[in-house]
Amino acid sequence: MFADNQMISGRQCARLLFFDFLGIGTLLLPGYLADVAGEDGIFAIAFGVAASLLYLKLLQKIVLGREETFLSGAGGGIAKAADGLLIALYGLYYVLLGGYALYLFGTLIQRTLLVEESFWLITLLGLVLAVYGMARGMESRARVYEVLFWLVLIPFLLMLLLAVADVSPQQQFPMATAAPGDVLQGAYLVFLVFSLCQMLLFAGNVISPEKAGRAAGSAILFAGLLFAVLYEILLGVFGRVTVSELEFPAVSLMSMVTLPGGFLHRQDALMVGVWFFTLFALICSSMYYSCQCMEKFRGKSVLWRGIPVKKWILLLCG
């Protein structure tokens, strides 16, 4: 039996954050990095990871330095008003983030699996599922993704391993040719993905700040390593120009990898499941934390009263 205390462990927190990073990062980063940094994209990833870890340390100091939770609105007067404004901005940020993740979710499913179906129908069904998942609470979602972690990750790693056979090392070189500004621009893009670790500001009600900080750090390092491996494989298989032109390079890579035995002809359809679960996790997280921000202004019952409004907001954003 599981304890129903709405608390999550450090491992569960790390896996939830990893899923949030993995979906949007593997879909978008390779093309952007190839466009701005080319063969030096690997350095941009390294710098982006380093900057994200420093940012995480700053967040930890902010959270640990407060006597109350970030959402409690400690203090009064100007301080309380500033807190309220900041939380409102974070709430808007999570609404927009959830809307964009929902857009990616619908676009990917339609273009790879359900070509004949309506984009709006796909996103609406995904949104209904996300609302249900969010309403079940953080602890329930954490349990689900703890179980799904290796079920999703092992096929992804297997496909990367099989893709190594098609890598042409000459397409990964020469390195150290991009302008420093281009590498820094790429690092900033990586940092934007990992800046999702700011969710720990609002996670004080489900996990201690110390555990959340360690979990976020491990998730950043693991995801950063995976981004680097994926990027180098994509460069070696497609080359810089092709990677920069493909809409979803990682999905294209999965579609061309052949499994031994040839018993599965549409393994790309199977691999879309990776992004189905990871983008779904990001949508649920965005909804959960935006509702946490709404609680600040409308009371605890907002988590339920805000759901119908949130559905329409996210749908419009998508």
Name each model-derived stretch.
Residues 25-119, 128:
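Membrane helical hairpin/interfacial module
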Residues 105, 120-121, 133-163:
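Membrane-interface loop-to-helix entry segments
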